Amino acid sequence: MAAEAKTSAKAAPSATTAAPKGGAVKGGVSKDKGPKHTPSIPKVRGGRKMRIGYVVSDKMQKTIVVELEDRMRHPLYGKIIRTTKKVKAHDENSVAGIGDRVSLMETRPLSATKRWRLVEILEKAK
């Protein structure tokens, strides 16, 4: 009996290691790519970020500086913390002025520091 157990133990590893080459598996299913009948679904691109802020500078050509405000609740103390960030945005027609409330959309890098573009002017400054 002990001899039979040793021979069957030796035979088992050789049977599991003898897999067909090229990643093909019996039944037409590949380990890497899934079943053949499964259609490939293109990955959906994430939506672009939209932000609303106030123009603080319009002195550059076709560029505005917009102050974006972000409010978050402190995880431990619960206080509302207000943080601001200034970003450069592309204004093709140079229509936005200082104090305007504008809507921005994230876009591909347009320059070393410009990654936003003006979508619309929500409210003109008085």
Swiss-Prot record:
Q: Where is this region: Disordered?
A: 1-46
> Which cellular component appears as one GO term in the record?
cytosolic small ribosomal subunit
The record's annotation in CDD domains points to: Ribosomal_uS17 (cd00364)
GO terms (BP aspect): translation
Biased composition, class Low complexity, residue ranges: 1-23
Q: Which family does it belong to?
A: Belongs to the universal ribosomal protein uS17 family.
Q: What does this protein do?
A: One of the primary rRNA binding proteins, it binds specifically to the 5'-end of 16S ribosomal RNA.
Self-association or partners: how does it assemble?
Part of the 30S ribosomal subunit.
The protein here is known as Small ribosomal subunit protein uS17
> What organism is this sequence from?
Mycobacterium leprae (strain TN)
